[in-house]
């Protein structure tokens, strides 16, 4: 029996983060054998063609030029007001939904997901997401006494599986009042899949019918961490307008992040943006989440908020920023295209990639295959049902031939 003084709910907690562990192994290998000989497809961060972490110059310049007060001062608990306005503007683009919108600064996109689960479910409740999901969702749920449950994201044709989704939502709705559903789109981590507009229409029609019965509230959480790397600016944002004029029993919360789009991963800045047709529900959203912020991190990194606000407010700076960011989006797309074409050529199965940082190869033997690939200095992430490859971090010269390497490793192990 383990000696412990932890509270019952905390006993036995232990983080097994395969991503950071594998990333560490890749770095150690690169140190020993040279970076150009090691394929590091582990972390969700943009690296350039020389393997260096990218800090957008337009962002760096603005960040380093801030005054001391902006660099080290406290920020308001809800966030710097200019930042919140900029986050809404940049998140929604031309598709800002009609309705009452309230925003709160959060510790990256993760912080918003934490608050949403904490404040809109009861202890013991279940939270729903797709079976291809970012592992932190599960940790956030279990840490606060909730359970993450999943539906099959894809049907046989690799389209959104409406039947599986509806069945799962109905199961939850029968057991609990609030149904919290997390979507990670566009550019889902780990698959790169984006929910199409016609699928959103079906999803929302179904949820409207559900709340019309009068027993449930539905809280839609949308993690848009990869929004800026998933397609044409306005096209990928078009679906936001669908969240206006929904019944008041449906609350939408968009979890927006500066980590990827502004390359400020470790600064931990994002915003949770609530959308409701009912002003009281929108105001409640602001108050309860502000309170939880005070009780969790107190306030958010001021210089990163100010940097983003300044760039978005200045048309000249914003244009330069967008051009620079888009050049990296194009780079990631080119890398993904190399992999996609070569995978098709050798016959390596792959889930439908539309954008974002990652590509996924479905397999039940991810651990064994990833261990086999490490022998060839290839580091990718083993998931429960597949292998995640970070297109954001692998230079083109290393992306070339990678699909074949993975295919051959699977073949050697008899796992195709």
Question: Which role fits each region the language model picked out?
Answer:
Residues 15-107, 416:
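N-terminal small-domain helix-loop-helix segment of the aminotransferase-like
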Residues 67-217, 227-246:
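Conserved core of the PLP fold type I
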Residues 221:
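Generic enzyme active-site microenvironment
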